[in-house]
Amino acid sequence: MQNAGPLDPLTSGGILHAILGTLIMIAIALAVVIPLGVACAVYMNEMPGPFSRFVRTISEAMTALPSIVAGLFIYASLILILGFDKSGFAAAMAISVMMLPIIIRASDVVLRLVPGSLKEASYALGAGQWRTVWHVTLPTARSGLMTAIILGTARGIGETSPVLLTAGFTAALNVNPASGPMVSLPLATFEFVKSPEPTMIARGFGTAAVLMFLVLLLFIVARIIGGRGPGNLSKSQMRRRAKRSREDHQRFTKREASRSDSVQPTPPSSSSSRSLDFGDSP
């Protein structure tokens, strides 16, 4: 878009810089919020107490946080206090503030739906609490956790004001999130639509259509992944489970066969044979 003016036709310019900027910001935000959000949800479920209730209260309050407040917080902390430039990284941090409570609350609900019988079976086999979380709870709730992450991504991909405050606006392509302004699809839509030229307004509606398509695609993927409840396996997972069951059966069969071969019948001793002969004599 840096070589296209307001009066140029729609065949010139494009929104590649906005698409790549959006993907880069969302990727950085996901790298931050996925481990932090899932860890908070696991902590609230596995370690009940005053601090877990405090974390739940904060996460619930953050869901009603205006996006402009998140943008101002990152702008004041990273740009004004720490001296960072306006960049895609700062915008990703602001977006992560908006995504984090969504992922925490959705993951908390999903982890609560994991059947307690699965955890009790793991404890009965001798597994500890965190080993049960890693090998039983999280794999069982994997589809729900993926849905929570996708819903949080759909929330963050449509934020405008945090990006405007922390990343600025540019018409040039910038793939370096550490320096220089970077634009997203919502911010590009806002900048295009506020222009008085019909061509720029048309560009804004086209950018909004691309953004709507991305959000709709995310919701479709979330619906497909979230169609299964916790513990309900997909076809590929059922095939893997059947394969592992056959392997376990073969391994236990070989073990029992080796044990039976190692145990040989002991011949009777001489003293016992003599006693038997003595008993048989008249």
Task: Place the predicted regions along the sequence by residue.
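Interhelical loop and adjacent transmembrane-helix boundary motif
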Residues: 3-9, 13, 163-213
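Alpha-helical membrane-interface segments at transmembrane helix boundaries
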Residues: 12-24, 28, 52-65, 75, ...
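Hydrophobic alpha-helical transmembrane segments of multipass integral membrane proteins
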Residues: 20, 24-32, 36, 40, ...
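Transmembrane-helix boundary motif in ABC transporter permease subunits
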Residues: 29-59, 72, 223-231
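Transmembrane alpha-helices
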Residues: 30, 106, 129-166
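Generic hydrophobic transmembrane alpha-helix motif, especially the helices
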Residues: 60-97
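Glycine/proline-centered hinge or cleavage motifs at structural transition points of membrane proteins
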Residues: 66, 125-126, 139
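C-terminal transmembrane helix and the adjacent membrane-cytosol boundary/short C-terminal tail
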Residues: 108-112, 123, 191-259, 267
